[in-house]
Amino acid sequence: MRPLSTQDEQLLRELLDASASLWNELTYDRRQQFFDGDSVWDATDYRRQYVGVLGSATAQQVIRKNSEAWRSFFAALEDGEDTAPPGYWGNENDGRELRTHIRNDQYPLEIGERSRLEIPVGNDPKDEYGLGYHDRLRLEVCGAPKWDDEQDRLDLYYDEVDDTFGVIQPVTVPDSRQDSPLADEAAALDVGANNLVACTTTTGQQYRYDGRKLFRPFRETTEEIARLQSLLREERDSSRRIRRLYRTRTRRRDHAQNALVRDLVERLYDEGVATVYVGDLTDVLSGHWSARVNEKTHQFCAYRSFIDRLATTAEEYGITVEIRPEAYTTAECPACGEREKTERDGDEFWCPCGYEGHADLDASRTFLGQQAGTNPEVGSMARPVRLK
């Protein structure tokens, strides 16, 4: 999403900042009431303070989103989850996070050769920015949405790491319009540190996503964060630069995960895969002898967020994701079944029976055999997938 002029960008920032201010004021009020034992629903009506800048519909939408966050918080408490009350958009040191929510009937979105989006503006800024009473802020939109059914609330945000404005449009799609698997094949994934994903399918295809090059800048950023933390005064635990590096690191990781998941799911869909088995790493995540592997597994691979992305993307294609235990898959020889005398060194796997192979690909193949009851014939070399 791009403003059409410097003036439009300034107005967009003003709208996003006002929305963040509204969210933070309401959140502060409700948090104080919550910790004082009072009802959070008795908070001040902040809509009137912001309707002049945002317009009535947008101000109400931000308040409604805040209320949804509190209802989710209370529901989690009732389920016994260890959770915290809704937080703020930004903080005092770094400033507010520029975000807003636009009601589903308040934004015309035209997709074409020059896609555009129009969002409402309150009356107060219109004279300053040369807008008429009925005018809206017009923005250029890049990309084409996959779905075009009933549109939901629009989420706008500013990404300070990439210095870009973004837009997210949830769409309600009937089950009849979602893709269905082309066949009833299965796939098994070995999620790891050096190879982010090793995959084997019942059709005999194997895919390997190498994470070493992607991990290198992640590791360098982590080391720079540690260096800057060592220079802080004793009474401080962070700085604007450190927090920005954390956000940069997370954004790069999330981008890599999104690209990997999308690429993998599209390949599996083309192979006719209907079910994907993923190893349960709960026990692995509880600890590992190597601090470097721990860093990769916990922070870079971000297993749980990876699974969430995989399940959400797979759902678009009608593919089911199942989490299963993967005991002995990294030690078992796919040729003879030996577990005790096999050896592994990095990506290489050996068995006394004479078998040699790729450790992670063999693990995914063995895992697939455990879950799908089949040991498919695979090619001599898996397709290494390189993501930009």
Locate each region found by the language model.
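Nucleic-acid substrate recognition interfaces
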Residues: 1-388
